[in-house]
Design a protein with these regions (language model features):
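Non-catalytic, surface beta->alpha helical segment in thiol-disulfide oxidoreductase systems
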Residues: 82-83, 88-123
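Thiol-based oxidoreductase modules, predominantly thioredoxin-like and allied folds used
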Residues: 8-13, 32, 44-72
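N-terminal leader/targeting and pre-domain segments
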Residues: 1-28, 108-123
């Protein structure tokens, strides 16, 4: 990351995630993926670029579903996620599991449009 921004890489539980939403400085961006996921690898560079371009009031999280299984399994159960990769965005004040914005899949054109939209909202 060129910005020196630190990236959250794991949540011990879904409760730890909710705790983060409570102190959200502006936006929380969470990408769920896995080392073994081909589509996740396909968009890896684009996601890193997106994270590096996010302003300081955006907390970025790159979460491996195998390392934070409690949160991912809960998101699947609540139908917030149905596969990986998925990127979800929560706005300050939203302390629920339902994200304000999300992008599912590895289509680079669609992801680039999502990134443009999010960066304009983050300003």
């Amino acid at each position: 990351m060129s910005s020196g921004k630190s990236i959250v890489t794991e949540f011990e539980s879904r409760h730890a995630f909710l705790d983060l939403l409570k102190v959200n400085p502006g936006f929380v961006v969470v990408k769920f993926g896995a080392d073994w996921c081909g589509p996740c690898k396909k968009i890896h560079d684009e996601v890193n670029d997106f994270f590096s371009r996010c302003p300081q009031h955006v907390i970025c999280c790159d979460i491996d579903v195998d390392d934070s299984f409690d949160l991912y399994a809960f998101m699947k159960k609540k139908k917030m996620a149905n596969g990986i990769p998925v990127i979800m965005v929560w706005k300050k004040g939203n302390e629920e599991y339902i994200p304000d914005h999300s992008y599912i899949g590895s289509d680079k054109d669609g992801l680039n449009e999502f990134v443009k939209l999010m960066l304009s909202i983050f300003e």
